[in-house]
Amino acid sequence: MALRKKVVCLLAMAMALLMLCGTAMADNFSFLPSRTENGKEYLAHPSSELTTILLIGYDHYANGQIEEEPSQYHLGGQSDFLLLLVIDHKNQQIHQLQFDRDTMTPIKLVATNGKDAGTRRLQLCLAHAYGRTREENNRNTIWAVEKLLGIEKADDGAEIDYYISMDISGINKLNELVGGVTVTIPNDDLLALDPTLKGGETIKLTGMQAEYFTRTRYDTAEPTNEARMARQRIYLNSLETLLEEKIRANVNYVNTLLNEMGMIFDRTTTLDSGFGFTTDDATGTAITDTTDHYLMANVSIDNLALLANRVMDYEVLDVETLNGVHSLGSDEHIHFDLYENEALNWTLKTFYTEADGN
């Protein structure tokens, strides 16, 4: 599948759980040093060979209920959807890694005065909650993902080049804009919410059905994030096919879709900036003329189009996940603990090559 379609799609998952449409400048500035693991030396791929994009889908629900009065520095909502794209220009491949929102990992905290309050091992999804602005929420999420994968710099600079975040309350709008997405319902988990969402049935999702299918975890027969992640991948695959058809029919369709969803350009999150928290006002600039802005990115729409062209014929690899164990923590919330070296092994195979002679 060509990539203006697939990345947009991929990035449409981002709108399905996000929405992207390509991206990756001709040059990026991320840098990883060589490293030694288990007596073997690994060399990082040159920065010119890789472009990384984090897709963040977040909402403002807690245990199925919207947070009516979040604290001043806890405004971001939790990131229920996280997908990292690693674009390998040398091998012309796109790696995809989807994270379980309940993955336990260090995240940055913010005190009531807005200052950095250190780190704590919590669910990955909570990283997005801390901060007063959307920019801060996204920067904190980037840092947490980098920390989990072991690719962060000592000075908190970015190894992840770009991000696109979406308030996933916009999923119904996205679904409506594309004319509805057809999926095969995998099981009867959602019957209590909508009797038409019966396992084995193939239907076009309309209205609230898209939200039920992609966002619901509580009040289902299988209330785990793993089950929801599986439904999200089903939705993405169908959305990819639909977008491919629409893009082939109209090359400007992606720009139209992005404009309808509304996007804010984050000018503050660059590869040269520190990721510490500040109390500065947000400096995001709306770059679409819509009333609502469901999307934020630290890359412009014009540059989003550049990569789509550059990677048009790249191979898009299957979505990967990290393995681990779910359990009920002492805080009465689900914890997902990765197996030992699970994240490290993915990082080594994706960002590094083993040095000759080892």
Where are these regions (language model features)?
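Non-catalytic, solvent-exposed segments at the cell envelope interface
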Residues: M25-N358
